[in-house]
Amino acid sequence: MMILSIIATVVLLGALFYHRVSLFLSSLILLAWTAALGVAGLWSIWLLVPLAIILVPFNLTPMRKSMISAPVFRGFRKVMPPMSRTEKEAIDAGTTWWEGDLFQGKPDWKKLHNYPQPQLTAEEQAFLDGPVEEACRMANDFQITHELADLPPELWAYLKEHRFFAMIIKKEYGGLEFSAYVQSRVLQKLSGVSGILAITVGVPNSLGPGELLQHYGTEEQKNHYLPRLARGQEIPCFALTSPEAGSDAGAIPDTGVVCMGEWQGQQVLGMRLTWNKRYITLAPIATVLGLAFKLSDPDRLLGGEEELGITCALIPTSTPGVEIGRRHFPLNVPFQNGPTRGNDIFVPIDYIIGGPKMAGQGWRMLVECLSVGRGITLPSNSTGGVKSVALATGAYAHIRRQFKISIGKMEGIEEPLARIAGNAYVMDAAASLITYGIMLGEKPAVLSAIVKYHCTHRGQQSIIDAMDITGGKGIMLGESNFLARAYQGAPIAITVEGANILTRSMMIFGQGAIRCHPYVLEEMAAAQNNDVNAFDKLLFKHIGHVGSNTVRSFWLGLTRGLTSHTPTGDATKRYYQHLNRLSANLALLSDVSMAVLGGSLKRRERISTRLGDVLSQLYLASAVLKRYDDEGRHEADLPLVHWGVQDALYRAEQAMDDLLQNFPNRVVAGLLTAMIFPTGRHYLAPSDKLDHAVAKILQVPNATRSRIGRGQYLTPAEHNPVGLLEEALRDVIAADPIHQRICKELGKNLPFTRLDELARNALAKGLIDKDEAAILAKAEESRLRSINVDDFEPEALATKPVKLPEKVRKVEAA
């Protein structure tokens, strides 16, 4: 009985941690339990004395603080990693949303499913069906990329007339004031037609003068610039990146010095600016330049510090000395992008966005706005491109035949085709879910980094898969190619607004560990403020948090999550239970990693990368489950749901295993392995059978396939190869049963070629009627158009000689 009572006590202790019972109530329960066992004669009643001696100090705050919290507090202050001003502002900026739940070890799935699904207003739907549809029709991507290296003038004029650059600007200033959700839908539709078109529209609606002015501008600045930006009268750009500082924006060498100077014939307070920027989208044609620089005030003319820090200003590009106009040439996707320079240019102090009081506040402004822009523009552009590519590649795989069968039926093709379909579904779920948070007023910095990285990365991988499937069709450039420019341009999205290597290895977990953790950020604040009282309360909440996640990790690993709560009992039930387990695992691994490695975790990028991967996969899986629920839980969509969640579970478990295999403290790694994998690893990548079901969805018209491509431009217009492939798919499917019937009548397995000739012969023999012959002829026309590629006269591929800038000759010393 003694052994059973000990086991029961351990189970009770575990249950208290598992359910996160408060310290005081847990202490009372343990004392009562010990007393009951003593009365029953199983334990000595005198055990209450040592137990009380242990528990009382934990529950008496002054004693607990002096004996435990104060020494820990002193040690914590010593090991707390140093944090630069820019890092602190990045962490302090923005908010935590659903990713915070995932990080805490016990996600509230009911809360996730209660987030309202955005609905398009009549105005927003009309914009998508009208101006956006027309802009897609006007865009000829081959002409844009090969002939013009720019949007045609009539398309530029159309975008300005219909206020495409004003989706984020409020109606009071003449803007459209669209929701984040509809902005995402617009960009997805445009990117399925032309990457240049989507980038051109997306950037002014992301991080730029419009966004910064609305949040921080003075009334005078807003009233002057916002109506002009809304009308397209002003073209904005924002210059942050320098040759010497790409991802490390805090190291920008561009400078401004507060001083007095002459402006329009008068002596005014202003700044002398010097900058050298590159990679600035819209800079070559911009009329107003948003500029980030480090501002100093050596004479303290503003009355504050000498070194004010990063500041943002708006500079009309007509200002004498501002250099714009030259262009970069990014991977044959020539959107307007180029350098800008200025040397010792004097401008009034009122050019600072928000006026002089916002001097030195630029980095906070940028980070707060960047989390919104990064969460919409780049993920939406990548997602829209992959959605269109998924439909087109699926159609091509059905239409294209080798060895008398559609190539889409070959297992070698099914594997990458399933990845394309699965990624399109997952990416759209992830890109949509973050817009829900933004519309609720959140500025999710960590989540925007997750979505930016995974949508652009999966987008690139999906484009590579599509190129493997389409072969020569994807390689040969021309108006009928739906893939090559997306393939060429994929690294652009990977690189901009936080290069993906940096985003994955430093930003996702680097910010997530502090911002998403329920206690660490407040503990750091308490340490910085030398507040032992606040630290004491947080410390014991933190200890309970670690204990809870240790118990939850072990128990959910032992039972494979079978006992954990789920919001549904259908085919997705087990996924919620698996995610409950992984969430507890992540919380435990994060706390132990921070405790063992301390400040060095910041430099252990491969460890933080893997922890960030787990958090990311938890988000992607939950986004898939949220999408499935929002769309009505269609059973036909389950193959995509299974693929998306199983892929995420497998990748998350792999990341944890890799982390434990490489954890520097091997003793701790062994203990963690026992806690997290008590019965070993269990999750598998999507099976061949599931890949087959997913790949099949893309190859025939159906409701699930339509949901994959929802909102894309699929009109079979002259310059829309995706729409023409959709039309061809319908034509070929309509012809297929007629072709099979002819084969049966003739007793031959005829190839699915020369259908027009076959139609004439079959009609002459009375095997088909005129309508069926017309269907076969139409299918042959569409089939040939789909599999053929463009060719050109040799001179059509030549370009004009590029005029290089003259090199300045060095003057030799005498």
From Swiss-Prot:
Enzyme Commission number, as recorded: 1.3.8.7, 1.3.8.8
Catalytic reactions of this protein: a medium-chain 2,3-saturated fatty acyl-CoA + oxidized [electron-transfer flavoprotein] + H(+) = a medium-chain (2E)-enoyl-CoA + reduced [electron-transfer flavoprotein]; a long-chain 2,3-saturated fatty acyl-CoA + oxidized [electron-transfer flavoprotein] + H(+) = a long-chain (2E)-enoyl-CoA + reduced [electron-transfer flavoprotein]
GO MF terms, alphabetically ordered: flavin adenine dinucleotide binding; long-chain fatty acyl-CoA dehydrogenase activity; medium-chain fatty acyl-CoA dehydrogenase activity
SUPFAM superfamilies named among the record's database cross-references: Acyl-CoA dehydrogenase C-terminal domain-like, Acyl-CoA dehydrogenase NM domain-like
GO CC, alphabetical: cytoplasm
Pathway in which the depicted protein is active: Lipid metabolism; fatty acid beta-oxidation
Cofactors, names only: FAD
Any one GO BP annotation for this protein: fatty acid beta-oxidation using acyl-CoA dehydrogenase
Domain of life: Bacteria
Top enzyme category: oxidoreductase
Gene3D superfamilies: Acyl-CoA dehydrogenase/oxidase, N-terminal domain (1.10.540.10), Butyryl-CoA Dehydrogenase, subunit A, domain 2 (2.40.110.10), Butyryl-CoA Dehydrogenase, subunit A, domain 3 (1.20.140.10)
Keyword entries, A-Z: FAD, Fatty acid metabolism, Flavoprotein, Lipid metabolism, Oxidoreductase
Active-site residues per Swiss-Prot or TrEMBL entry: 497 (proton acceptor)
Flavoprotein found in the keyword field: yes
A Pfam family the protein falls into: ACDH_C
Matches recorded under PANTHER family: ACYL-COENZYME A DEHYDROGENASE, MEDIUM-CHAIN SPECIFIC ACYL-COA DEHYDROGENASE, MITOCHONDRIAL-RELATED
Family: Belongs to the acyl-CoA dehydrogenase family.
Function: Catalyzes the dehydrogenation of acyl-coenzymes A (acyl-CoAs) to 2-enoyl-CoAs, the first step of the beta-oxidation cycle of fatty acid degradation. Is required for the utilization of medium- and long-chain fatty acids as sole carbon sources for growth. Is needed for bacterial survival during carbone-source starvation.
NCBIfam families cross-referenced by the UniProt entry: FadE_coli, PRK09463.1, PRK13026.1
Identification of the protein by name: Acyl-coenzyme A dehydrogenase
Organism, scientific name: Salmonella typhi
Chain's gene name: fadE
